[in-house]
C-alpha cells in the first residue's frame, strides 16, 4: 500500500538535506524510522512530550556556557552596562515571547506545522537563510492569524 505520509516526510527530509538544514533532515529521518518500526507506538508520547523535551534540551544548550564557566559572571554583569547588550537582551525577550506564542499556535493549529517547516526549508535554500526554527516562525504567524 502506498504511504503518502511517508512520501511527504521523505520529501521534507530531502529538502532539508538540499538546503543544508541537517537539523530538520535528521529529525524527519528519525521520525521516519519511528514510523516504519514498532517504535510507532510511541507517537502519542512523542506528540505530547516532544516539544517540551526539545525546549529543555535547547535550554540546556543555551545555559551550558554559564554552567561550564565559559561565560564568566563578569561578562553577564557587563551585559547590563553596554547599550548593544541591552538591545540584545530586549531582542531576546521579544524572541522568547514570540516562541511562547508559537508553541501555543502549534498546539492549537497543528496543520500549520508543515507550512512552517516548508517555509523554513525554502528560506534556507532560496535566500541563504538560517533555520532559526519553527517556534519563532509560528510566533510571527500568531501575530497575523491569532493564537487560537
Curated annotation (Swiss-Prot):
Name under which the protein is recorded: UPF0756 membrane protein YeaL
Pfam families reported in the protein's UniProt record: DUF441
GO cellular component: plasma membrane
Annotated keywords: Cell membrane, Membrane, Transmembrane, Transmembrane helix
Leader sequence residues: none
InterPro entries tied to this protein: UPF0756_TM
HAMAP family linked: UPF0756 (MF_01874)
Subcellular location: Cell membrane
Organism of provenance: Shigella boydii serotype 18 (strain CDC 3083-94 / BS512)
Transmembrane portions of the chain: 14-34, 51-71, 86-106, 121-141
Keyword presence, Membrane: yes
Family membership noted in the UniProt record: Belongs to the UPF0756 family.
Membrane topology field: Multi-pass membrane protein
Amino acid at each position: 500500500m502506498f504511504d503518502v505520509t511517508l512520501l511527504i516526510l521523505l520529501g521534507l527530509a530531502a529538502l532539508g538535506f538540499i538546503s543544508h538544514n541537517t537539523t530538520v533532515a535528521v529529525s524527519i529521518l528519525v521520525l521516519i524510522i519511528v514510523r516504519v518500526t514498532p517504535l510507532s507506538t510511541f507517537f502519542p508520547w512523542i506528540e505530547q512530550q516532544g516539544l517540551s523535551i526539545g525546549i529543555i534540551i535547547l535550554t540546556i544548550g543555551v545555559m551550558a556556557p554559564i554552567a561550564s564557566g565559559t561565560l564568566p559572571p563578569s561578562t553577564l554583569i557587563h551585559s547590563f552596562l553596554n547599550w548593544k547588550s541591552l538591545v540584545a537582551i530586549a531582542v531576546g525577550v521579544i524572541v522568547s515571547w514570540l516562541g511562547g506564542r508559537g508553541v501555543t499556535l502549534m498546539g492549537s493549529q497543528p496543520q500549520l506545522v508543515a507550512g512552517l517547516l516548508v517555509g523554513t526549508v525554502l528560506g534556507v535554500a532560496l535566500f541563504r537563510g538560517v533555520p532559526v526554527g519553527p517556534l519563532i516562525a509560528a510566533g510571527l504567524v500568531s501575530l497575523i492569524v491569532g493564537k487560537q
